């Protein structure tokens, strides 16, 4: 266990500065309303409209002239109890148990304690990082259960059979957490008051409109301290934003992928290379993020964005239940890839990872220690604010070159699904039993890509939006120095194109 460290020098208590302010984003209050209700509805729609009952997409969507609500509900597998069936107390308790397990591992496993970037009040928060060993322990337990019980291991069957109820449980948790953090943000010290806990309002989160501020997040880096006296301060202090970003959602994404593999095996008696490939790439991305966990401290989510419904929903609901759509599709439609298709996917992924990790490592090393021998070849602009802007290496190619790598890697999640689309047909097997089979017909071929490539389109749009926010922030921070920088590094994300 790491030695106990205080979060601030007792001799000097930071004073709360006047918080910065930013204009509306995401369409302001109206956009916040649409996002809050629209995105959760979208997740349920994607789940029901690409299924193992009638097909992906459901047949009625391809025949709008004969579309009826009753037929659509039948093909989507809509429960007879209606919305009431979306919630189950037992499922919610088990989902909460998963969160508690993740919290217990955070508190009691040893971890690295790292200081974050400097805050507006001139202090620095400290963070404990042990998400990787926590994930390894949980995945190890699942591996043991699978070894003993195979694809019928209770976790795998539970996740597939109660998928909608699990979405609802996570949605409830995300809403409750967002309400708690929003209400608690009103106890942040006023400007000019002592601020020993280093609590701050997020620049974009105190517009005065309650709905918008709830959505975007009022407090920057909200934290709670657990009443556990026999562990050090870092272990009992939970940074809600970082904890949610790096733990339940990310690992939940991979666990759902593994349950989809188990479902494919239970149904067909074998596992296809496509579902393995997609899962391996996604797992590698997650484990790499957990291994590089301290790098999260330099991301916009941590240094600029408040924690509100947007991040709570994104971390706990959107990531696990949108990002596993590809393997969920392949669990029903067992596609085998040819060698040349596999090589193409490997090439795209390798290029993306080289750009993503190389650029981020270079940025982190340069920020920590510009005199690092590995950084001696890097050219930079010295700004009037004291910061240095790299104009060579990866960051001389484009101002957000890491976003290009991130997006290229995301192709490897969707490409294994191919030209997606299937229909479920029923037939009688040799034993006289009714069986369902997923087949691809010319009528549905390609339409399934709306689902399996949705992540790719969404992620590209997200990165472009983030790049735009980065640009506005840097223009405001660096002024004429930023103009000089952009005249040297002209490309935004894709060198020579955008």
From Swiss-Prot:
Q: In which pathway is this protein known to take part?
A: Steroid metabolism; ergosterol biosynthesis
Q: Fetch the InterPro entries from UniProt.
A: ERG24_DHCR-like, Sterol_reductase_CS
- Broad class of where this protein is predominantly found: endoplasmic reticulum
Swiss-Prot/TrEMBL keywords: Endoplasmic reticulum, Glycoprotein, Lipid biosynthesis, Lipid metabolism, Membrane, NADP, Oxidoreductase, Steroid biosynthesis, Steroid metabolism, Sterol biosynthesis, Sterol metabolism, Transmembrane, Transmembrane helix
Segments crossing the lipid bilayer: 30-50, 91-111, 136-156, 163-183, 275-295, 302-322, 339-359, 444-464
EC number(s) per entry? 1.3.1.-
Top enzyme class, one word, equals oxidoreductase
One GO molecular function term of this record is: Delta14-sterol reductase activity
The keyword DNA damage appears for this protein? no
Annotated knockout phenotype: Results in decreased hyphal growth and virulence; as well as to hypersensitivity to azole drugs. Deletion of both erg24A and erg24B affects ergosterol biosynthesis and leads to the accumulation of the intermediate 4,4-dimethylcholesta-8,12,24-trienol.
* Protein location: Endoplasmic reticulum membrane
Positions glycosylated per UniProt: 257, 429
Keyword hit for Lipid biosynthesis: yes
Q: Which GO terms describe its biological process?
A: ergosterol biosynthetic process
Which Gene Ontology cellular component terms are annotated?
A: endoplasmic reticulum membrane
Q: How does it sit in the membrane?
A: Multi-pass membrane protein
- Provide the residue positions that the database annotates as binding NADP(+): 363, 367, 395, 402-403, 470, 474-478, 485
On the tree of life, the source organism's domain of life is Eukaryota
Q: What does this protein do?
A: Delta(14)-sterol reductase; part of the third module of ergosterol biosynthesis pathway that includes the late steps of the pathway. Catalyzes the reduction of the C14=C15 double bond within 4,4,24-trimethyl ergosta-8,14,24(28)-trienolto produce 4,4-dimethylfecosterol. The third module or late pathway involves the ergosterol synthesis itself through consecutive reactions that mainly occur in the endoplasmic reticulum (ER) membrane. Firstly, the squalene synthase erg9 catalyzes the condensation of 2 farnesyl pyrophosphate moieties to form squalene, which is the precursor of all steroids.
- Entry's PANTHER family? DELTA(14)-STEROL REDUCTASE, DELTA(14)-STEROL REDUCTASE TM7SF2
Q: Which family does it belong to?
A: Belongs to the ERG4/ERG24 family.
Mention any additional remark. In Aspergillus, the biosynthesis pathway of the sterol precursors leading to the prevalent sterol ergosterol differs from yeast. The ring system of lanosterol in S.cerevisiae is firstly demethylised in three enzymatic steps leading to the intermediate zymosterol and secondly a methyl group is added to zymosterol by the sterol 24-C-methyltransferase to form fecosterol. In Aspergillus, lanosterol is firstly transmethylated by the sterol 24-C-methyltransferase leading to the intermediate eburicol and secondly demethylated in three steps to form fecosterol.
Supply the name of the protein: Delta(14)-sterol reductase erg24A
Classification from the root reads: Eukaryota, Fungi, Dikarya, Ascomycota, Pezizomycotina
Q: Which gene encodes it?
A: erg24A
């Amino acid at each position: 266990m790491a030695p106990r460290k205080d979060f601030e020098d007792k001799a000097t208590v930071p004073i709360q500065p006047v918080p910065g302010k930013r204009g509306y984003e995401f369409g302001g209050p109206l956009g916040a309303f649409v996002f809050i209700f629209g995105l959760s509805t979208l997740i349920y729609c994607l789940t029901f409209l690409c299924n193992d009952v009638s097909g992906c997409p459901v047949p009625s969507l391809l025949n709008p002239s004969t579309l009826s609500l009753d037929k659509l509900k039948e093909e989507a597998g809509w429960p007879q109890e209606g919305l009431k069936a979306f919630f189950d107390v037992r499922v919610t308790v088990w989902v909460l148990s998963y969160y508690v397990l993740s919290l217990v591992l955070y508190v009691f496993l040893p971890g690295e304690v790292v200081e974050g970037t400097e805050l507006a009040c001139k202090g620095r928060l400290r963070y404990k990082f042990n998400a990787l060993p926590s994930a390894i322990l949980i995945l190890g337990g699942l591996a043991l259960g699978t070894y003993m019980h195979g694809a019928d291991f209770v976790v795998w069957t539970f996740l597939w059979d109660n998928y909608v109820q699990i979405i609802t449980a996570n949605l409830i948790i995300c809403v409750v957490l967002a309400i708690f953090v929003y209400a608690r943000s009103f106890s942040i010290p006023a400007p000019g008051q002592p601020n020993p806990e280093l609590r701050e309002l997020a620049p974009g989160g105190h517009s005065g409109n309650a709905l918008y501020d709830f959505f975007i997040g009022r407090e920057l880096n909200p934290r709670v301290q657990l009443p556990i006296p026999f562990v050090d301060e870092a272990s009992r202090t939970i940074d809600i934003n970082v904890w949610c970003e790096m733990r339940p959602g990310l690992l939940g994404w991979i666990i759902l992928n593994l349950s989809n593999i188990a479902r494919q095996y239970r149904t067909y008696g074998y596992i296809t290379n496509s579902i393995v490939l997609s899962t391996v790439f996604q797992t590698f991305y997650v484990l790499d993020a957990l291994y590089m966990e301290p790098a999260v401290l330099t991301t916009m989510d941590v240094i600029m964005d408040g924690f509100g419904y947007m991040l709570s929903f994104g971390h706990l609901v959107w990531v696990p239940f949108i990002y596993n759509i590809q393997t969920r599709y392949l669990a029903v439609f067992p596609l085998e890839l040819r060698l040349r298709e596999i090589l193409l996917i490997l090439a795209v992924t390798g290029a993306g990872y080289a750009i993503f990790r190389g650029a981020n490592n270079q940025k982190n090393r340069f920020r920590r220690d510009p005199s690092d021998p590995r950084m001696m070849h890097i050219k930079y602009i010295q700004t009037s604010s004291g910061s240095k802007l790299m104009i060579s290496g990866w960051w001389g190619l484009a101002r957000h070159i890491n976003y290009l790598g991130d997006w290229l890697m995301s192709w490897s999640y969707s490409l294994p699904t191919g030209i997606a689309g299937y229909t479920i047909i029923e037939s009688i097997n040799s034993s006289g039993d009714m069986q369902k089979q997923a087949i691809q017909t010319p009528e549905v071929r390609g339409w399934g890509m709306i689902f399996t490539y949705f992540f790719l389109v969404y992620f590209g749009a997200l990165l472009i939006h983030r790049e735009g926010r980065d640009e506005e922030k840097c223009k405001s921070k660096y002024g004429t120095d930023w103009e000089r920088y952009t005249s040297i590094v002209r490309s935004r994300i894709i060198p020579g194109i955008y």
